[in-house]
Amino acid sequence: MNKNLKNVFFVLIIMMVVLIIAYNYENNAGATKDISYSDFLNMLEPVEGKKPLGKLYKGNVDKYNKIQIEKDVIEGFYIPSEYLESKTAKPVKFRTTVAPLDKDLIASLRKANVSFDARSAEEGKFWSVIGSNILLIVILIGLFWFIMMRQIQSTGNKAFSFGKSKAKMTMDPKVKITFEDVAGCEEAKEELVEIIEFLKDPKKFHAIGARIPTGVLLVGPPGTGKTLLARAVAGEAGVPFFSISGSDFVEMFVGVGASRVRDLFDQGKKNSPCIIFIDEIDAVGRLRGAGLGGGHDEREQTLNQMLVEMDGFEKNEGVIVMAATNRADVLDPALLRPGRFDRQVMVDLPDIKGREEILKVHSRKVPMTSDISLHSIARGTPGFTGADLANLINEGALLAARKNKKRVTQEELEEARDKVMMGPERKSFFISEKEKEVIAYHEAGHAILGTLLPYTEPVHKVTIIPRGRALGLTQSLPKEDKHILPKTYWLDQIIVAMGGFIAEEFKFGVTSTGSSNDIQQASNIARKMVCEWGMSEKLGTVNYSGDQTNVFIGRDMGHSSKYYSEEFAAMIDKEVREIIQTCLNKGRDLVRKNASKFEGLAKALLAKETISHEELMTIVHPANEEGAKKKPEKTVKSKKQNGIKANPAYNE
């Protein structure tokens, strides 16, 4: 039944109810008055000296002018005495009981020329009472049921079917997503293409004795494209695709989750071959027996049912389960074993090539100028996910539209990247001249050390315009993605982090609260060098941090987070202080030796507020000096760097 027919049906029911109510009201207009039999006879044959109640109605309307006789009951209409002279008087309905011995009633009626009619007590009552009142009740119940069902369907639920699966089946979506719309995760695509080939041509795999994986688990950080990959599989497979969220299984009603799992797999078997996709499966697949509330709850029942459905006594031939999560560490081991989720596909952060491909995909529908360099944007966005890059392109388009441009230029993309990475500019934020000077020298300290040290990333931009929660920023962008970072790199990172502290100390003789985050960052690096990365000779290659994964309440509570004695705790603190102090001394020496460049950069920041990489290199490396950052020598003359031994292998 389409929407228009439903509306017509709804209107007809309302009209019927209104008509029945009006009919009953008309029939029962005015209350029936019970009178004595003597009063009735007095109106029929008035007695001298006794005033009658009125006059029996004998008008032209058949509805009123007949006396109805049903066994010992008489009903009719009369006009009260006080309204006899009125032409608009409305008859009053009366009822009386006939005396059982009155045999002259009929003769009296005939003598008075009163029309009358006799009927049995049952006649007409079924249709008048049952036909109107009960029919009205039935219609009202039907109307209530219709409204209730319509309301339930409009909210997407099913009445009395809490245990039914909420999975949505996709066969041929209008907006079809394919693997051409997915970039930056080629290995993951290859794994999934194999599953699609099996669904399209299973004989090819059966002939060689291969068994397709029962389940595929997509694992990766948020925003890397796990759900997008699943949508691409739905577009490519050409088979029914059921999608559901892990949170849709668990409700407030006990047993609903397990029932929905059964119903979901029943639907899958009926539509085999098919794919079932469960997004955020960690909502239902968490480790059993772990938690403050005990080992048995609704989630465990749901998980147990899912384990049975995926690999129990009954085989689900042709039903492939896909799932996505960014918390694979909290999933139950029984869910991850071969036979259930045979294959785990890692969807990690894209590298520079992957980021460039993702930018190309998202920029297809965005008009851009011909001089756009997506490679430079990709190089300047390390650690960005696919969702971040899509947001960057959208922000660039919004900025271009705000400037009334027809095409997006490199300027908008650069500005959008800075906005996504560092937050929007707060040009209206008031800063006094004294504070602005402190900020300028603080950022100049970061920038000058980041440019002079050999193992740091190139400084891309320095600004004293507040962005987000920061009052000033020094942005460094790597030339390439790095996966193995040596000790020398981290030592230089500590020096750069403390650059603002060193600059304030050198220029003003005192430091400010603006260095608090820098100190925290440097301390974290130094502590990891000592406790996790084995970069301390005194403490050796021992892990003092324990398991650094996210705590799972119930499994990890009560476990000690301290893996060393008080003696070693003091040694760790001492080693961390020594590393930071050594880096501070080297940073102070560099700033002191390059004081003129440091002053020039700070004054340029006060004048321009933002300094680009090219302007920075002009200040730090004038034309008469070497125009590039000094590179480390290929041979190691000394095995120590500022009193801390460095690994010679990384200096080559």
Curated annotation (Swiss-Prot):
Topology versus the membrane: Multi-pass membrane protein
Membrane-crossing residue ranges in chain numbering: 5-25, 129-149
Residues where Zn(2+) binds: 442, 446, 518
Record region (Disordered): 622-652
Listed cofactors: Zn(2+)
Keyword ATP-binding set for record: yes
Residue intervals on the Cytoplasmic side: 1-4, 150-652
Protein name per the record: ATP-dependent zinc metalloprotease FtsH
Organism: Leptospira borgpetersenii serovar Hardjo-bovis (strain JB197)
Lineage: Bacteria, Pseudomonadati, Spirochaetota, Spirochaetia, Leptospirales
